[in-house]
Amino acid sequence: TREAVTERFDRVVVATGHFHTPHLPSWPGVETFPGQVQHAHDYRSPEPYTGRRVLVVGSSYSGQDLALQLHRAGAAHVTTAYRARPQDIAWPAGMDEAPEVQGFDGAEVTFADGSTAEYDAVLLC
């Protein structure tokens, strides 16, 4: 038998899975990166990143959330890379922002402003 149920809510979340299929960008030299490159789609917990330097590519809400979670769980340093504009967030010590990724040379990542930094892992959001 079917029973109709009516309920009222203050808020409703519609999670349709629009971003279910990960977008995996390709940068020059990414194949030389010795660490792990993983999409947030496959991320399960921050523990594997404890003590590591992590680059989070994508600085919108999911990227910011992931970056803060990694920081709180003990990542050595977390950088969020943005494409359009910086988020202008007062990040805690051990976190920062960088412009768009331009390429990799081993563990060293080059950003759009010419700056470079070394990372142990890259998470794509």
Report the location of each language-model feature.
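Core Rossmann-like FAD-binding/catalytic domain of the broad FAD-dependent monooxygenase superfamily
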Residues: 1-3, 16-17
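Core beta-strand elements of the Rossmann-like FAD/NAD(P) dinucleotide-binding domain
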Residues: 2-11, 50, 112-121
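Glycine-rich dinucleotide-binding loop and its adjacent helix/turn
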Residues: 14-73, 78-80, 90-97
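A Rossmann-like FAD-binding core segment of flavoenzymes
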Residues: 68-125
